[in-house]
Protein backbone atom coordinates (compact mmCIF):
# COMPACT_ATOMS: atom_id res chain seq x y z
CA UNK A 1 0.00 0.00 0.00
CA UNK A 2 1.43 3.37 -1.03
CA UNK A 3 1.96 5.90 1.72
CA UNK A 4 -0.02 9.09 1.16
CA UNK A 5 2.30 11.92 0.14
CA UNK A 6 2.39 14.96 2.44
CA UNK A 7 2.09 18.21 0.50
CA UNK A 8 4.61 20.85 1.53
CA UNK A 9 3.24 24.36 2.04
CA UNK A 10 6.20 25.83 0.12
CA UNK A 11 4.89 24.15 -3.03
CA UNK A 12 1.73 26.29 -2.88
CA UNK A 13 3.34 29.70 -3.33
CA UNK A 14 2.05 31.45 -6.42
CA UNK A 15 -0.84 29.05 -6.99
CA UNK A 16 -4.44 30.21 -7.33
CA UNK A 17 -7.12 29.27 -4.74
CA UNK A 18 -8.72 26.80 -7.14
CA UNK A 19 -5.49 24.90 -7.75
CA UNK A 20 -5.87 21.14 -7.25
CA UNK A 21 -2.67 21.09 -5.20
CA UNK A 22 -4.06 23.70 -2.80
CA UNK A 23 -7.35 21.82 -2.51
CA UNK A 24 -5.47 18.60 -1.76
CA UNK A 25 -3.28 20.42 0.77
CA UNK A 26 -6.36 21.70 2.64
CA UNK A 27 -7.70 18.17 2.95
CA UNK A 28 -4.70 17.29 5.12
CA UNK A 29 -6.21 19.38 7.93
CA UNK A 30 -9.63 18.84 9.49
CA UNK A 31 -9.87 20.60 12.86
CA UNK A 32 -7.92 23.08 14.94
CA UNK A 33 -5.68 21.76 17.68
CA UNK A 34 -6.59 22.53 21.30
CA UNK A 35 -3.89 25.22 21.44
CA UNK A 36 -5.09 26.78 18.18
CA UNK A 37 -8.72 26.84 19.32
CA UNK A 38 -7.93 28.36 22.73
CA UNK A 39 -5.67 30.94 21.08
CA UNK A 40 -8.23 31.84 18.45
CA UNK A 41 -11.00 32.37 21.01
CA UNK A 42 -8.83 35.02 22.66
CA UNK A 43 -7.90 36.50 19.27
CA UNK A 44 -11.53 36.82 18.19
CA UNK A 45 -12.40 38.63 21.41
CA UNK A 46 -9.52 40.92 20.48
CA UNK A 47 -8.49 42.15 17.05
CA UNK A 48 -8.72 39.14 14.74
CA UNK A 49 -11.36 39.14 12.02
CA UNK A 50 -13.04 35.82 11.32
CA UNK A 51 -15.12 36.14 8.19
CA UNK A 52 -16.64 34.33 5.30
CA UNK A 53 -16.25 35.99 1.91
CA UNK A 54 -19.20 35.76 -0.44
CA UNK A 55 -17.45 33.36 -2.77
CA UNK A 56 -16.27 31.08 0.05
CA UNK A 57 -17.94 28.15 1.73
CA UNK A 58 -15.83 28.44 4.87
CA UNK A 59 -14.41 31.05 7.24
CA UNK A 60 -10.93 32.56 7.15
CA UNK A 61 -8.89 34.65 9.58
CA UNK A 62 -7.42 38.11 9.00
CA UNK A 63 -4.67 39.47 11.26
CA UNK A 64 -3.41 43.04 11.62
CA UNK A 65 -1.13 44.41 14.36
CA UNK A 66 1.57 47.01 14.79
CA UNK A 67 3.78 44.55 16.65
CA UNK A 68 5.67 42.51 14.06
CA UNK A 69 6.88 39.92 16.57
CA UNK A 70 3.32 39.27 17.71
CA UNK A 71 1.87 38.74 14.23
CA UNK A 72 4.79 36.47 13.38
CA UNK A 73 4.01 34.46 16.51
CA UNK A 74 0.31 34.17 15.61
CA UNK A 75 1.18 33.12 12.06
CA UNK A 76 3.32 30.34 13.54
CA UNK A 77 0.42 29.19 15.72
CA UNK A 78 -1.77 28.84 12.61
CA UNK A 79 1.14 27.96 10.34
CA UNK A 80 -0.54 25.24 8.27
CA UNK A 81 -3.34 27.65 7.31
CA UNK A 82 -1.15 30.62 6.30
CA UNK A 83 0.68 30.50 2.98
CA UNK A 84 2.22 33.98 2.74
CA UNK A 85 4.25 35.76 5.47
CA UNK A 86 3.03 39.02 7.07
CA UNK A 87 3.25 42.12 4.88
CA UNK A 88 3.83 45.74 5.83
CA UNK A 89 0.86 48.05 5.38
CA UNK A 90 0.80 51.85 5.60
CA UNK A 91 -2.25 54.07 5.89
CA UNK A 92 -3.27 57.44 7.31
CA UNK A 93 -5.62 57.71 10.27
CA UNK A 94 -8.42 60.24 10.71
CA UNK A 95 -5.86 62.81 11.89
CA UNK A 96 -3.75 62.36 8.79
CA UNK A 97 -0.94 60.61 10.67
CA UNK A 98 0.85 57.66 9.10
CA UNK A 99 0.03 54.30 10.71
CA UNK A 100 2.19 51.25 9.99
CA UNK A 101 0.85 47.77 10.65
CA UNK A 102 1.55 44.18 9.65
CA UNK A 103 -1.09 42.06 7.95
CA UNK A 104 -1.57 38.38 7.25
CA UNK A 105 -4.44 36.00 6.65
CA UNK A 106 -5.26 32.33 6.42
CA UNK A 107 -6.98 30.65 3.53
CA UNK A 108 -10.63 29.73 4.06
CA UNK A 109 -11.02 26.37 5.75
CA UNK A 110 -13.67 24.29 7.48
CA UNK A 111 -11.48 24.15 10.60
CA UNK A 112 -12.52 27.76 11.33
CA UNK A 113 -16.25 27.16 10.85
CA UNK A 114 -17.00 26.02 14.41
CA UNK A 115 -15.85 29.32 15.93
CA UNK A 116 -16.97 31.33 12.91
CA UNK A 117 -20.58 30.27 13.32
CA UNK A 118 -20.30 30.57 17.11
CA UNK A 119 -19.03 34.15 17.16
CA UNK A 120 -20.44 35.73 14.01
CA UNK A 121 -23.98 36.89 13.36
CA UNK A 122 -24.85 39.18 10.44
CA UNK A 123 -21.12 39.83 9.89
CA UNK A 124 -20.68 41.07 13.48
CA UNK A 125 -19.02 39.49 16.51
CA UNK A 126 -21.45 38.55 19.27
CA UNK A 127 -21.08 37.24 22.82
CA UNK A 128 -23.06 34.15 23.78
CA UNK A 129 -23.96 33.43 27.43
CA UNK A 130 -21.86 30.26 27.68
CA UNK A 131 -18.66 31.72 26.17
CA UNK A 132 -16.56 32.32 29.27
CA UNK A 133 -17.71 29.38 31.36
CA UNK A 134 -17.45 26.80 28.57
CA UNK A 135 -14.77 28.10 26.21
CA UNK A 136 -12.38 30.68 27.64
CA UNK A 137 -9.24 29.22 29.22
CA UNK A 138 -6.20 30.89 30.75
CA UNK A 139 -4.55 30.71 27.33
CA UNK A 140 -7.58 32.38 25.70
CA UNK A 141 -7.49 35.09 28.34
CA UNK A 142 -3.80 35.71 27.68
CA UNK A 143 -4.26 36.12 23.93
CA UNK A 144 -7.26 38.35 24.48
CA UNK A 145 -5.07 40.51 26.72
CA UNK A 146 -2.16 40.57 24.24
CA UNK A 147 -4.60 41.56 21.50
CA UNK A 148 -6.72 44.13 23.27
CA UNK A 149 -5.53 44.59 26.83
CA UNK A 150 -3.48 47.26 28.51
CA UNK A 151 -2.93 49.40 31.57
CA UNK A 152 -5.60 51.60 33.10
CA UNK A 153 -3.32 54.38 34.33
CA UNK A 154 -0.85 55.79 31.79
CA UNK A 155 1.01 57.96 34.29
CA UNK A 156 4.64 56.86 33.96
CA UNK A 157 5.22 57.08 37.71
CA UNK A 158 2.04 55.27 38.66
CA UNK A 159 1.97 52.37 41.10
CA UNK A 160 -1.56 51.51 40.02
CA UNK A 161 -1.56 47.98 38.60
CA UNK A 162 -5.12 48.11 37.26
CA UNK A 163 -5.63 46.74 33.75
CA UNK A 164 -8.32 46.87 31.08
CA UNK A 165 -9.64 44.71 28.28
CA UNK A 166 -10.89 46.86 25.42
CA UNK A 167 -14.36 45.64 24.50
CA UNK A 168 -15.70 48.74 22.77
CA UNK A 169 -16.93 46.65 19.84
CA UNK A 170 -19.44 44.79 21.98
CA UNK A 171 -22.78 45.85 23.44
CA UNK A 172 -22.97 46.89 27.09
CA UNK A 173 -25.13 43.84 27.86
CA UNK A 174 -22.55 41.55 26.26
CA UNK A 175 -19.71 43.10 28.25
CA UNK A 176 -21.73 42.64 31.44
CA UNK A 177 -22.06 38.92 30.62
CA UNK A 178 -18.30 38.69 30.09
CA UNK A 179 -17.57 40.46 33.37
CA UNK A 180 -19.98 38.36 35.41
CA UNK A 181 -18.60 35.08 34.09
CA UNK A 182 -14.93 36.12 34.24
CA UNK A 183 -15.46 36.92 37.91
CA UNK A 184 -17.10 33.55 38.51
CA UNK A 185 -14.66 31.41 36.54
CA UNK A 186 -11.38 33.09 37.46
CA UNK A 187 -12.31 34.58 40.86
CA UNK A 188 -11.71 38.11 39.56
CA UNK A 189 -13.39 41.37 40.57
CA UNK A 190 -13.80 42.95 37.14
CA UNK A 191 -16.23 45.79 36.58
CA UNK A 192 -17.45 47.86 33.67
CA UNK A 193 -15.97 51.24 32.77
CA UNK A 194 -16.57 53.45 29.76
CA UNK A 195 -14.15 54.92 27.24
CA UNK A 196 -15.81 57.51 25.00
CA UNK A 197 -19.18 56.01 26.01
CA UNK A 198 -18.08 52.52 24.94
CA UNK A 199 -17.85 49.67 27.49
CA UNK A 200 -14.52 48.24 28.61
CA UNK A 201 -13.59 45.66 31.24
CA UNK A 202 -11.71 47.04 34.25
CA UNK A 203 -9.44 44.67 36.21
CA UNK A 204 -8.70 46.33 39.57
CA UNK A 205 -5.32 46.80 41.20
CA UNK A 206 -6.09 44.15 43.83
CA UNK A 207 -6.57 41.52 41.09
CA UNK A 208 -3.24 42.18 39.39
CA UNK A 209 -1.32 39.28 40.95
CA UNK A 210 -4.12 36.81 40.26
CA UNK A 211 -4.52 37.98 36.66
CA UNK A 212 -0.74 37.98 36.16
CA UNK A 213 -0.49 34.37 37.30
CA UNK A 214 -3.36 33.34 35.03
CA UNK A 215 -1.93 34.78 31.83
CA UNK A 216 1.83 35.14 32.29
CA UNK A 217 2.71 31.57 31.20
CA UNK A 218 1.24 32.32 27.75
CA UNK A 219 2.44 35.90 27.20
CA UNK A 220 5.23 35.97 24.62
CA UNK A 221 8.41 37.91 25.55
CA UNK A 222 7.69 40.74 23.09
CA UNK A 223 4.33 41.41 24.80
CA UNK A 224 5.51 41.22 28.42
CA UNK A 225 5.54 45.02 28.53
CA UNK A 226 1.76 44.89 28.92
CA UNK A 227 2.21 43.29 32.33
CA UNK A 228 3.50 46.36 34.11
CA UNK A 229 4.85 44.79 37.27
CA UNK A 230 6.49 41.45 38.00
CA UNK A 231 4.98 39.27 40.70
Swiss-Prot record:
<keyword id="KW-0378">Hydrolase</keyword>
<keyword id="KW-0496">Mitochondrion</keyword>
<dbReference type="InterPro" id="IPR004860">
    <property type="entry name" value="LAGLIDADG_dom"/>
</dbReference>
<dbReference type="InterPro" id="IPR052500">
    <property type="entry name" value="Chloro/Mito_RNA_Process"/>
</dbReference>
<dbReference type="GO" id="GO:0045292">
    <property type="term" value="P:mRNA cis splicing, via spliceosome"/>
</dbReference>
<dbReference type="GO" id="GO:0004519">
    <property type="term" value="F:endonuclease activity"/>
</dbReference>
<dbReference type="Pfam" id="PF03161">
    <property type="entry name" value="LAGLIDADG_2"/>
</dbReference>
<protein>
    <recommendedName>
        <fullName>Probable intron-encoded endonuclease 1</fullName>
        <ecNumber>3.1.-.-</ecNumber>
    </recommendedName>
</protein>
<dbReference type="GO" id="GO:0006314">
    <property type="term" value="P:intron homing"/>
</dbReference>
<dbReference type="GO" id="GO:0005739">
    <property type="term" value="C:mitochondrion"/>
</dbReference>
<comment type="similarity">
    <text>Belongs to the LAGLIDADG endonuclease family.</text>
</comment>
<keyword id="KW-0540">Nuclease</keyword>
<comment type="function">
    <text>Endonuclease involved in mitochondrial 21S rRNA gene intron homing.</text>
</comment>
<dbReference type="InterPro" id="IPR027434">
    <property type="entry name" value="Homing_endonucl"/>
</dbReference>
<keyword id="KW-0404">Intron homing</keyword>
<dbReference type="GO" id="GO:0000373">
    <property type="term" value="P:Group II intron splicing"/>
</dbReference>
<keyword id="KW-0255">Endonuclease</keyword>
Amino acid sequence: MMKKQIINKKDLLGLGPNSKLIKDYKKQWTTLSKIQEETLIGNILGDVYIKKLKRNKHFLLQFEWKNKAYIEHIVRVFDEYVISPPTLYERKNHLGNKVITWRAQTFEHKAFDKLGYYFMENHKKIIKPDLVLNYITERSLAYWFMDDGGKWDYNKKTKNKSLVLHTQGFKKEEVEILINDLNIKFNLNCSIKFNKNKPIIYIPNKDYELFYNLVNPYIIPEMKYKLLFNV
